[in-house]
Every structure is written in C-alpha cells, then in structure tokens.
UniProtKB/Swiss-Prot annotation:
NCBIfam families: glut_syn, PRK05246.1. InterPro entries: ATP-grasp, ATP_grasp_subdomain_1, Glut_synth_pro, GSHS_ATP-bd, GSHS_N, PreATP-grasp_dom_sf. Mg(2+) binds at E281, N283. Pfam families: GSH-S_ATP, GSH-S_N. GO terms for cellular component: cytoplasm. Binds 1 Mg(2+) or Mn(2+) ion per subunit. Belongs to the prokaryotic GSH synthase family. The gene is gshB. ATP binds at residues 151-207. It catalyses: gamma-L-glutamyl-L-cysteine + glycine + ATP = glutathione + ADP + phosphate + H(+). Its cofactor is Mg(2+); Mn(2+). This is Glutathione synthetase. It comes from Shigella flexneri. Its EC number is 6.3.2.3. Residues 125-310 form the ATP-grasp domain.
Amino acid sequence: MIKLGIVMDPIANINIKKDSSFAMLLEAQRRGYELHYMEMGDLYLINGEARAHTRTLNVKQNYEEWFSFVGEQDLPLADLDVILMRKDPPFDTEFIYATYILERAEEKGTLIVNKPQSLRDCNEKLFTAWFSDLTPETLVTRNKAQLKAFWEKHSDIILKPLDGMGGASIFRVKEGDPNLGVIAETLTEHGTCYCMAQNYLPAIKDGDKRVLVVDGEPVPYCLARIPQGGETRGNLAAGGRGEPRPLTESDWKIARQIGPTLKEKGLIFVGLDIIGDRLTEINVTSPTCIREIEAEFPVSITGMLMDAIEARLQQQ
C-alpha cells in the first residue's frame, strides 16, 4: 500500500468544490493509498532526521463533512512513499525552511511533489525568463527610471510583485496615467524590492488560461479565467469567471516546449498561465483548477498525477 502524505493549509477551511488538493486526496484514497495529513507546524527536524506529527485521513465528497481523522502518529517522513507539498503561497522563509525538511526525507527515498530544490529555484514569475521566446516583453528591476522607460516604450503595461498570488497587487498602467510613480514606489518599496513589468496583452479579454502539466505532459484541457466588469485580472480570486476549454495549438506548443524542463526538475504538477499565445507565469507551489476542468471534460487530471507518481515510485 502506498503511503501518501500531504502538507496543506487547514483542510477544515477548504472549498471542496474547487480545491485541487482535495481532488488529489479523493483519487489517492480511491486507489487504496493510506493518507497522512500534515500542516506546516507538524514538520520538524531532530538531529537531521525529518519527522512529522501526521493524522491518518479519510475524505469524502460531502459538502457538510468532507474529512475525518482516523488516527495520529509521530513518524519519520521517510516512512511515507510520497509527500504532496500543497501549502499555498506566500513563498516566504517559513516555506523555504519546510522545503529543507522535506529535502531530508527526499534524500532517504521519499518522493516529494514538487521537488524541494526546484520549489526554491523556480520562482513563479522569474522562471519564465528561461523561456523568454514565449513570454511578453518583460523587465525585472528595482529601478523606477527603468520602469518609466519601459512604460514609455510600450505605453500600456502590467506591473506586479514577484511574490504575489491570486492577482494581488497587479497594476495596469496605461498611457498618460499619472500614478506610475507611486505604483513603482509601492511595488519596489522605494527601490528595495524587485518587481516585474510586462507589456499589456489585449488577449486578456479572452481569458488568462491555466494549462496544467503532469510530469511533463500537458493536460489537453485548460481553464480560461475571464476578467469581469472592466477588470484587468482574470484570477478567480480577483472575481474572474472560469471557463474550461480545449488547448489551442499555441497552448500545446508552449506546454510541450516547457514540459521536458519541468520533468527534469522534478516539477511533477505545474500550472502554466498563458494569455493569448504568451506565457506569463509558471506556477509550481500549489497549482489549482483541477476540479473546474474535470467537471466539464472527460479527463482525470488526478488520475494522470497518481499514474505519474506510481511510475516514479517504481523507477526508484
């Protein structure tokens, strides 16, 4: 029997209709895995050994009562076959410390999804720089004068922090906007923090597409998140409307170009953000949108994921 651990935000607070981690747990349980639930505070290191307080978990598709704990134990993380690291951002120092603990278990043979080193290496905004032929024009800087020059060149730009999620602190600055200076000061914290600028992509009106990639293989359907009511942001957390769709030819091209690098880096479950035919982000920490896509199309993304995990476990 495969022992699967998951590190996530409190399961009591999730919306099971939309929660991808919950979808993963349902599929793992359907396959007879033993589920071990952990929150960040349950992980610890003792004399170099990664351990955790885990609670054995049952889940069910019930909106009133979707989980129950059936046991608890303190164990070495190496006792688990696989651990899903599904803690939502912020990607802060606490998150980084947790990846070091998980890495100690990985060294003892536990499969960590996604690979701890790659979680640290692949910032969701900056990692797109390795695929610059696929992205919009992109500037990463702390320098207000550089941001101003970029804006003057493109006249309509998007500014965002490197550590945001859910569309937080994303600004559109159009030609003639008097607020560029204060936005630049806010995002760079007066020149002490990097931010990202990209030329505005009018294709956002048709949606910001979330394309999921499982161990290098693109899922054939995506979720387009369409901005509502004059918004620039399509993020569901910012009020965007989700519309599942088949991948376009350019979606396939982008996902297939990036897929081998993701697989090589142990990034087994990844969400690409694509606007039109441009890659804007590579989400590696806790990608979502499984449930919305599975509800609309005949595809089991969680099945693809568990198949990939089982294949990797057999290779070890």
